[in-house]
Structure formats: C-alpha cells, structure tokens
Amino acid sequence: MKKSLLFALCLGLATITAAAQRNNSQVDPIQPVPTAKQVAWQKLETYAFIHFGLNTFNDKEWGYGNSDVKTFNPKKLDCEQWARTLVAAGMKGVIITAKHHDGFCLWPTRTTDYCIRNTPYKNGEGDVVGELSLACKKYGLKFGVYLSPWDRHQASYGSPYYLKLYQRQLKELLSNYGELFEVWFDGANGGDGWYGGAEESRTIDRRNYYNFPRIFEIVDSLQPNATIFGDGGPGCRWVGNENGFAGETCWSTIPSNTVYPGFKDYKQLQFGWEDGDQWTPAECDVSIRPGWFYHEKEDSKVKTVEDLCDLYYKSVGHNATMLLNFPV
C-alpha cells in the first residue's frame, strides 16, 4: 500500500513538473513569420502614390531623359493641399516619385544638374520632396520615396560609376527628409534612352547590376523603420500587375533568392507561393486615372467610388495593401 501511494505521488509530481516545463518553454513559430515592421505596414491598408515631375509638363508617361529642365515650372504648387486631400480621402501615407526613369530629380541633389535646382520653380530654390515631407508631418501622413534605378538621362548608366551616383542619391533622400515609411524600387530597368546624348538602348544584368543587397543595407542603416518595396521585396513585393488587385488566394510568402527586378514569372506574384520561405506580402499599385502622370485628356476618366471600393476589396480584401496613384 505504501509503495503504491509513493508511486502515485512520484507520478503526479513528474506530471506537474513536465507541465510546468511546457508552459515555461517558448513554442517555436512556424516559419516564416512577419516582422513587427511588416505587420505595422500592412495595417496601413491604403496609402497614396504621387507621380509628378518633368513628365507632367511634357505630357509623357516615360520621359526619354532629354526634356529641358526649364519646362518644369509649376505656378501654384501647394503640397499642403495635396496632403489635406489625401487625408480627406483616407490615405495613411504618400510616396513621391523623387526620380522617375527620365532621371529628373525633384530635390536639389548634388549628384546631377538634371534636377529641380536648375528649373524656374522658386528660382531654383524649390524642393518638392522637402515640401511634401513637411506637409505630411503637418497633417499626420506617413512619407515615402520612389527612386528609379533606371536612369535614361545619365551617360554612366550601365557602368560601375552609375552605381556610386545612385547610392549617393539614395543616401540624400534617406538622410534629409525625416522618417520614411517605405522606399520604392521600380522593376523597369534598361532599354532605350538619351544616356548623355548617346541615344541608344542599354541592357543590364537585372539580377546583379544594381547590387541590391548593398542598397538594402543602406536603407536599413539610415531608415530602419522603412519597408523596402521591390519586385521580390524584401519588405513587400509587387503584385504582378498595375490593375490594383491581388489573387483571391494571395500568400504573403515567396521563395527566397528567386524573384528579382524583371522576374519572368511575374504573374505568379499576385498569388504568392504557399510553400515560400520568405515573408514578403503584396502591394497593389494602381492609378486613379488611366495614366500614372497627369494628362489633361484623361480628366473625364477618373475612377468612380464604386471602382475604388471594388479595388479595395480585391487588394486589401485579398491580403495585400492598396497603393493608389494620384497624378498631379
């Protein structure tokens, strides 16, 4: 009897000890999982894109890189009006095309003369990136920048020297305009352009030329809270179309070291990969008008409230975010 009682007590003690150990040990999560930064980013749901630059004044979508900088001359530019409108529309932040493919810079960069510093706007003292950054702070919007890797203006594009120039441009944007919530890298790379007067077509090794690992290191070091957008992330990814929708099933995971700028199987990006080992959720970019830059002929073609509601359900409702472009 005593032996039976002693055995029962030992068994009970062992059970209690094992249970305590299970409760105190941390259960390993199923990998991959999002970072806290990615979770905060996805909770934004909707934010704005603004395409603005030389193309706006030359009625173009993709500038060739040789438009006269003097044509950039806005008379009534009011970034605070932009910010107020975006807040009223329910946007949580805005990303500005600091430099599009034509190479024109909306801030007074010291890396090139092809910038706002040499325009009539404010007698060369303007800085649209800075003005919008301040407006965002005033009205409670998050602020981000788009910096095209492809530059159809620069004679050095395609060479190692251009990479140094591009990194300097990136560091200027990351260092001088407060906290950024997203940094956007376009996947359109290489092709015909002015290239300092060469007027030719240039191709690059899309996987390796830009040295994106180094670029991402620069962003993480100077803007640790910024989500990095690229075709394959790493922070968030392109959804594989510019129509504003994700697949009905849209996994937040992709295979690591597979997706790169110009990725051939880009249509798969709208679905993601169920067995992907890298957490990189989708972002749905779409314009409120047919074009990304402003064109007067499209004034009657603005998306309706019904259109936008449908896009919201097909982007945010499909496990992505909605990046809505406003051409100004």
Annotate each predicted stretch with a short phrase.
Residues 1-22:
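Bacterial Sec-dependent N-terminal signal peptides
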Residues 21-328:
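Mature catalytic domains of secreted/periplasmic carbohydrate-active enzymes
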